[in-house]
Structure formats: C-alpha cells, structure tokens
Amino acid sequence: MYGVLSSPLELTGDFEKDIDIAYEYFSTAINDRKKRPTLFDKEVFIEAHEIIEGRPEGFWHVISLEENHHFKVLPCVNDGNIELCNQNCNASHHAIVVKYGAETRNVCLLRASRLPWIIDIIKLAGKNDSSVNVWLKPGTGRQNGKLYLRYNHHGADFVLIFSVEKRFYRLISSFPVFYTNEKENFDKDYRKYAWSYFDT
C-alpha cells in the first residue's frame, strides 16, 4: 500500500503573507526539534546558523531555487501556484541572498506550498512505506555520502536529499522532480544504490 501526501499549504499570491504562512509551518513542524521526526534512528538536521531577515537559512533554502537556474518548462506549469508568483523563478522579483552573500536564490511558492511533504516523506520512509524509494550514494574524498528519499506516486514526484553525517542526516535539498532527464537519472541511481535501513 502506498502512503499519501498531505495537501499543499494554501497560499494567497501575496508574497509576504505566503512567506509568513510557509514560515509558520516550517517553525512548528520542521524546525522544532521536539516535533521533527527522526529518520532511521538519527536526528534530521536543518541548517540554522545563518539568520536572514529573521529566519534561518534552512527555511529559505527549501522554499527557493538557484537564481541562475532558468526553466524551459516551469515546475508549477500544472499547479495553481503558477498564477500566484508571476514566474518568480525566472523573473527574480523576490530573491534572497544566502551562504553569507555567496548565493542568490529565488523564492518559489510551489516549493513553499510543499513543505508538509518533507515531513510526510520522512515519516513514510521511517515506516518502510513502498511509496518512497530510498538510496544511498557513497561519498567521494572528503564529501559525505548522500541519502535520497523519493516519493513518486499519485501524480507527485518529490525528492529529499540529505548529507549523511555521523549522528544525523542534514537536509540539503528538497524539490519537485519534473524534468525527464532528472527522473531518469534518479531512476538509474535508485537501481544502482538502493538501500534499506530495515535490511541492515
């Protein structure tokens, strides 16, 4: 049986209000260590060292995308959020600077609306639910291994990527998967690196 994801956050199209809505969810469900689920008996770490506009960098990272990423097809093309953001992913009218000034990212209301899926997918993976493909790519040199959780059912294709640390998994990215080549690459990686905590 496949698990089902929560409904996306209901947004308004007013960027400031929508960022507040997303941040309220992030603060209570994701950033609160007492409420945040564990993953395979390890804590999930959310980056919070850098505070930008009163909010941790980890929040901005999961609701935005790199400014230099230009889309041929918008990720929200079949989603109601396309009417709300005025193509901010390409227009850059709502940008945030992270990594102490080293990177500019564009706020993405599609990603913001999908914040509940981060918690859902972590919980489903923790139950060994067949809706989530899990794979572990080994690190190279000084680079840590990467743990991938991909939900691809009921019309939703969404991936979480974690850096594997000694005592925790550090969330480094989460996003909808919509490019054909990206889907194929993830399918290929899953076939090569499939991993199960429950078989170890």
Name each region found by the language model.
Residues 1-200:
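Ribonuclease/tRNase effector modules and their secretory precursors
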